[in-house]
A protein has these predicted regions:
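Residue-level recognition of short loop/turn positions
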Residues: 2, 153-154, 264
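N-terminal glycine-rich phosphate-binding loop and ensuing alpha1 helix
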Residues: 2-65, 280, 286
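Conserved beta-loop-beta/alpha segment of the NTase-like Rossmann-fold superfamily
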Residues: 65-66, 70-153
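Catalytic-core segments of class I nucleotidyltransferases/pyrophosphorylases
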Residues: 106-107, 114, 120-127, 140-143, ...
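Short, small/polar residue-rich loop motifs at catalytic or cofactor-binding pockets
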Residues: 252-256
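Active-site neighborhood of HAD-like aspartate-dependent phosphohydrolases
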Residues: 257-289
């Protein structure tokens, strides 16, 4: 029998310190937002895009997760397993422990996100570029406390800007890290697992180290809805967006309005229903509009 391989990892081991005023004694991923937990909303998205096996890394208040996971396994088709940290491993430290159980290319998601993205398009982008590490990026509405990337050619990350003590001086000139990644396992083989005292986020450890090794990192930039609820202000904004049905309508699974105009104000028509990665995918419109 073929061993089960996980195609998605959800990191839920954080303490959620900044949101304690709202969540109290409940871990952030389990706290209901507009009537449903962040964790369950994530699993709904993964099921919709045919993910088969999800592993959730937990640490803080782990017993609360264990009870809830049994309910979710009965409710959804995604097969959900748990990796419980004996000692805090940071956001990404568990990846080296569970590496042999991961698919060659897997999705990594921070557990405090409310999102709706088309994972099939993300996977197509990642595979077409033979990417080893793809960051899902977007225009951040809080760049001063986000990790940022410079992507002048549209896909290849040219530079990274790490926030320090939740501050980043780079502001609006660059794309923000969304907290969703697609990772090839070769990346883990090239790095030594972080020591417990050095445990950091995917961006601050994996992205930083791979960038220093001069291995190509790609940016999948999307206008789809991805927001963390790490502060009270953001939590209330996300809750309001959910109540007003603003989260799912920008998913690329649905047709979006778009207008391509070059620098000479020429309208451009995309000949194929996919990302423009080659000029052959374009054609000029002869008639006046």
């Amino acid at each position: 029998m073929t061993a089960k391989k996980y195609d998605a990892v959800l990191a839920c081991g954080g303490f959620g310190t900044r949101l304690k005023e709202i969540t109290k004694d409940t871990p952030k991923p389990l706290y209901p937002v507009a009537g449903k937990s962040t964790l369950e909303r994530c699993i709904q998205q993964l099921e919709y895009f045919d993910f088969k096996n999800l592993i959730i890394t937990i640490g803080y208040k782990s017993k609360k997760f264990l009870k809830f996971i049994d309910e979710l396994n009965q409710k959804y088709k995604v097969d959900i397993d748990i990796f419980e940290e004996e000692n805090p491993l940071g956001e990404c430290g568990a990846l080296w422990v569970i590496k042999d159980k991961l698919c060659n290319d897997f999705v990594f998601i921070n557990g405090d996100l409310i999102f709706s993205i088309n994972f099939k398009k993300l996977s197509f982008f990642h595979m077409r570029l033979s990417s080893k590490l793809t960051l899902v990026t977007h225009t951040s509405d809080h760049p001063d406390d986000s990790d940022l990337v410079s992507v002048p050619n549209g896909t290849l990350v040219e530079n990274i800007f790490l926030k320090s003590n939740n501050k980043n001086s780079e502001k609006n000139a660059y794309l923000g890290n969304s907290g969703i990644f697609m990772i090839n396992k070769e990346v883990l083989d090239k790095l030594t697992a972080p020591k417990e005292k050095d445990s950091k986020s995917v961006f601050h450890f994996i992205v930083k180290k791979i960038f220093e090794l001069k291995i190509n990192i790609y940016s999948y930039n999307t206008t789809e809805y991805i927001k963390d609820m790490g502060t009270k202000t953001r939590f209330l904004k996300v809750e309001k967006d959910l109540e007003n049905n603003l989260v799912y309508k920008n998913n690329y699974d649905f047709k979006q309005k778009a207008l391509f105009v070059d620098r000479d104000n020429t309208l451009i028509y995309c000949d194929k229903d996919e990302y423009i990665l080659n000029s052959l995918n374009l054609k000029f419109i002869d008639k006046n509009i």
